[in-house]
Amino acid sequence: KTTVTQMIAAVLRADASQPSMSTQGNLNNEIGVPLTLFNLRASHRRAVIELGMNHPGEIEVLARYAQPTIGLVNNAQREHQEFMATVEAVARENAEVIRALPAHGVAVFPAFDAYTPLWRELAGKRQTLTFGFEAGDVQAHEIAWTDGAWQFTLVASAQALPCRLNIAGRHNILNALAATACALAAGMKLADIVKGLESFEPVKGRSKSCQWQISGHAYTLVDDTYNANPDSVRAAIDVLAELPAPRLLVLGDMGEVGQQGAEFHA
């Protein structure tokens, strides 16, 4: 969530005519969300507010604070399983942001996910925007990893524009598509959205890569240490697999994985 939040923030900043603000760091809980909302000023026309949870019922409360007009459910993963028990519980909890939308609100979610039917049902008669690699209202075509960045064609609103994304991990293209859908719902032009995506810099500890030169050898370090669940670790391994050999994977513990902890770490 944090990466896509900051992507949306970067995109919103590309439209200087509409001042915006966003969640900083990980201020996404029952304390952080109110603190973030206190930073809203009359001059702000747009805001992106991250809602976090690790227990049932938290998103409903935070969404009541934030009162969103655009609600993004980015995915549902095996996170916080110690308290959420199942991925479906995570999907339903995340969907509380859709329930909180007004009748004129816009629900944004993946075009093809196991829980897409659930999110679409909860959206009801509200407008929806979906995203996916080659399906949905916002798509990415002709994807290639070149010179330390993703190059792809961003397709939306009957337009197709080239885009460069400066972050490792194919899954982060989906984050970019989610950010694009939210920005379109907020009334932004696709050309400005591309400018914002291309200005995005990875958040510390979240797929942030750096280059080292040691004894005449070039090394790429991808730092994804901020937090982890089984699905995000799988995504991190996929990032490593995309890099040239030799490769080294360094893993720590995953927290809040519940009774399946031993299985997930095996």
Residue ranges and their predicted role:
Residues 1-109, 118-124, 183:
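Phosphate-binding loop of NTP-binding sites
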Residues 34, 59, 84-87, 176-177, ...:
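Conserved strand-to-helix beginnings and helix N-cap segments that scaffold or border functional pockets
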Residues 47, 221, 249-250:
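Residue-level marker for buried hydrophobic side chains located in beta-strands
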Residues 50, 220-229:
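Active-site-proximal beta-strand elements of phosphoester/diester hydrolases
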Residues 53, 77-78, 113, 226-228, ...:
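Short, glycine/acidic-enriched loop or turn micro-motifs at the edges of active sites
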Residues 70-219, 245:
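Acidic, Mg2+-coordinating active-site environments of NTP-dependent enzymes
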Residues 203-205, 225-266:
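Active-site beta-alpha connecting loops in nucleotide-dependent enzymes
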